């Protein structure tokens, strides 16, 4: 059904990657090719309305905007 027993990596062109490190959907790359540092800053607003929108952004950051689809494709295809 999907590559690597369901643990697929997100490769170039939204195809099955070589990484196969789980459905965390990180792009397949070696450390010698590319290193990426990502910083997520969260703040607390004075009003509750400002905090509610921030919760959704945290969930998307964990998945990198990608999910495991059929045949180990990215769904949606937004891997970076």
UniProtKB/Swiss-Prot annotation:
Say if the entry is tagged with keyword Kinase.
no
| Keywords (A to Z) from UniProt | Metal-binding, Metal-thiolate cluster
GO terms for MF: metal ion binding
Q: Is the Endoplasmic reticulum keyword given for this protein?
A: no
Job of this protein: Metallothioneins have a high content of cysteine residues that bind various heavy metals.
What family is reported?
Belongs to the metallothionein superfamily. Type 15 family.
What is the name of the protein in this document?
Metallothionein-like protein type 2
């Amino acid at each position: 059904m999907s590559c690597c027993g369901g643990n697929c990596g997100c490769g170039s062109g939204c195809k099955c990657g070589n990484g196969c490190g789980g459905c965390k959907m990180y792009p397949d790359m070696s450390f010698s090719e590319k290193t990426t540092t990502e910083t997520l800053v969260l703040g607390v607003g004075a009003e509750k309305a400002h905090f509610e929108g921030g919760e959704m952004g945290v969930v998307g950051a964990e998945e990198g905007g990608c999910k495991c689809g059929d045949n180990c494709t990215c769904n949606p295809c937004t891997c970076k």
